[in-house]
C-alpha cells in the first residue's frame, strides 16, 4: 500500500488530494479543489498573475483540508507529487515549491508530474479502468491530442491539433456568442435547446506538404472563423442571433471530428479500447457520440469520471502512484517547472540531472 499527497496548480484550479494504491486499485482518500473560474470570467480568460496569487492563498488550506477529510497524517504518506509542466510558469511554481518544501520537511520523495500524464491517468479512477494497450483522446482547453498507451504505460502521440485546442475553440466561440467563461459548459447548456442540424460548419483538416491530409490530426481555427462569419451575416440582416441552434451545431461538429478521427485511428491500428480524458471529455454530446460510433467498430470506450475530467490533484496523485509502482526513481529536488514540455519527454522528469 502506498499513499501520495498530490498538488495541482498548472492553470486556474488550486487542488490537493491524497490518493492510495492498495490491492491493485486506486483509492481517493480526499480531494479538494478551489476554482478561480468566476474570478477569471470577468476577463474572458485566465489572467496568469491572478492565478498565481490565488494558488498561494488557497494551497495551504487545501492541504490542511485533505488531511482533515482523510483522517491520516504525514506519517502515513509515502511521497509528495506536484504538476511541474506544462502550464503557467508562475502557477506551476506555487505547487512545485510547496511540494518540494514539504518533501524536505518530512523527508519524503518528490515526484514532478507531467500535467497531461495526470489527465491520462484520470481514467484509472473509474470503476472499470482500462488496461493497456489503448488509445486516449485527450481533449481540454489547452490540448487536443491522440495518444497511444502501450502495455508498459509508455506514451506515443499519434494525432494533434495544429492550431486551437477543442476547449480553446469552445471558449472563443462562447465569447463571440456573448456567453460566459468557461465556454464549454456555457455552450453545452444552450446546445441542449437547439437543433444541431441548423447550420453546417466545416470539419477542419490539416494538409500534408506532399498533398492529401493528416488523417488523425485536428484543426479548429477554420471552424471558429466559420461561426464568426455566420454570426456577422445574421447580424447584418438585422435578425436575432439563434444562440441555441448555433451552439448545438458547433458542439455537434466538434464532437463529430473528435469521434471520427479517434475511432478511425483505433480501428486502423487494431486497438480495441478507446479512452476519453480532459475537460472537454465531460461534454455529454461528445460522450454519447463516442460510445455510439465506437460500438459500431467493436471498440470499448472508457471515460474518466466527470468529476475528474477537469484539472484536479487526484489525477496527479494517480500518475505519481503509477510511477512509483513501476519503479520510477523520485525527481530531483532541483527540478523546476516548464510552461512547455512534450509528454514523450516525461521520463526526463525523474533523472538525477533534471531537464529544467
UniProtKB/Swiss-Prot annotation:
Gene Ontology CC entries for this record: cytoplasm
Residues involved in substrate binding: 138-142, 171, 184, 283
SUPFAM superfamilies, per database record: Actin-like ATPase domain
Primary location recorded for the protein, binned into one broad class: cytoplasm
The keyword Lipoprotein appears for this protein: no
Biological process (GO), any one: tRNA threonylcarbamoyladenosine modification
The EC number(s) this enzyme carries: 2.3.1.234
InterPro entries recorded: ATPase_NBD, Gcp-like_dom, KAE1/TsaD, Peptidase_M22_CS, TsaD
Enzyme class: transferase
Cofactors demanded by this protein: Fe(2+)
Single annotated GO MF: N(6)-L-threonylcarbamoyladenine synthase activity
Annotated residues for binding of Fe cation: 115, 119, 311
Entry's cofactor comment: Binds 1 Fe(2+) ion per subunit.
Role summary: Required for the formation of a threonylcarbamoyl group on adenosine at position 37 (t(6)A37) in tRNAs that read codons beginning with adenine. Is involved in the transfer of the threonylcarbamoyl moiety of threonylcarbamoyl-AMP (TC-AMP) to the N6 group of A37, together with TsaE and TsaB. TsaD likely plays a direct catalytic role in this reaction.
Family: Belongs to the KAE1 / TsaD family.
Protein name per its UniProtKB record: tRNA N6-adenosine threonylcarbamoyltransferase
Species per Swiss-Prot/TrEMBL record: Prochlorococcus marinus (strain SARG / CCMP1375 / SS120)
Top-level taxonomy: Bacteria, Bacillati, Cyanobacteriota, Cyanophyceae, Synechococcales
Amino acid at each position: 500500500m502506498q499513499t501520495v499527497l498530490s498538488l495541482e496548480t498548472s492553470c486556474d484550479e488550486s487542488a490537493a488530494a491524497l490518493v492510495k494504491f492498495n490491492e491493485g486499485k486506486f483509492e481517493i482518500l480526499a480531494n479538494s479543489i478551489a476554482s478561480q473560474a468566476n474570478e477569471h470570467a470577468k476577463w474572458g480568460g485566465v489572467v496568469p498573475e491572478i492565478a498565481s496569487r490565488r494558488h498561494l492563498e488557497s494551497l495551504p488550506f487545501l492541504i490542511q483540508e485533505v488531511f482533515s477529510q482523510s483522517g491520516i497524517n504525514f506519517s502515513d504518506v509515502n511521497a509528495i507529487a506536484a504538476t511541474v509542466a506544462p502550464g503557467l510558469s508562475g502557477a506551476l511554481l506555487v505547487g512545485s515549491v510547496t511540494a518540494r518544501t514539504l518533501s524536505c520537511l518530512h523527508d519524503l520523495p518528490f515526484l514532478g508530474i507531467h500535467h497531461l500524464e495526470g489527465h491520462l491517468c484520470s481514467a484509472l479512477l473509474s470503476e472499470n479502468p482500462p488496461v493497456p494497450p489503448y488509445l486516449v483522446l485527450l481533449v481540454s482547453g489547452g490540448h487536443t491530442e491522440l495518444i497511444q498507451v502501450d502495455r508498459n504505460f509508455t506514451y506515443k502521440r499519434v494525432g494533434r491539433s495544429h492550431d486551437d485546442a477543442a476547449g480553446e475553440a469552445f471558449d472563443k466561440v462562447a465569447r463571440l456568442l456573448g456567453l460566459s467563461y468557461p465556454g464549454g459548459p456555457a455552450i453545452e447548456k444552450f446546445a441542449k435547446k437547439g437543433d444541431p442540424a441548423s447550420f453546417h460548419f466545416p470539419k477542419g483538416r490539416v494538409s500534408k506538404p506532399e498533398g492529401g491530409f493528416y488523417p488523425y490530426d485536428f484543426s479548429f481555427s477554420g471552424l471558429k472563423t466559420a461561426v464568426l462569419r455566420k454570426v456577422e451575416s445574421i447580424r447584418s440582416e438585422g435578425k436575432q442571433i439563434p444562440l441555441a441552434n448555433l451552439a448545438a451545431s458547433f458542439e455537434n461538429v466538434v464532437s463529430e471530428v473528435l469521434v471520427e478521427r479517434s475511432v478511425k485511428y483505433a480501428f486502423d491500428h487494431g486497438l480495441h479500447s478507446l479512452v476519453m480524458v480532459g475537460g472537454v471529455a465531460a461534454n455529454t454530446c461528445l460522450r454519447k457520440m463516442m460510445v455510439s460510433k465506437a460500438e459500431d467498430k467493436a471498440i470499448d470506450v472508457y471515460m474518466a469520471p466527470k468529476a475528474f475530467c477537469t484539472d484536479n490533484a487526484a489525477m496527479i496523485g494517480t500518475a505519481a502512484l503509477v510511477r512509483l509502482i513501476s519503479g520510477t526513481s523520485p525527481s530531483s529536488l532541483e527540478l523546476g517547472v516548464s510552461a512547455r514540455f512534450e509528454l514523450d519527454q516525461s521520463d526526463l522528469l525523474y533523472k538525477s540531472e533534471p531537464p529544467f
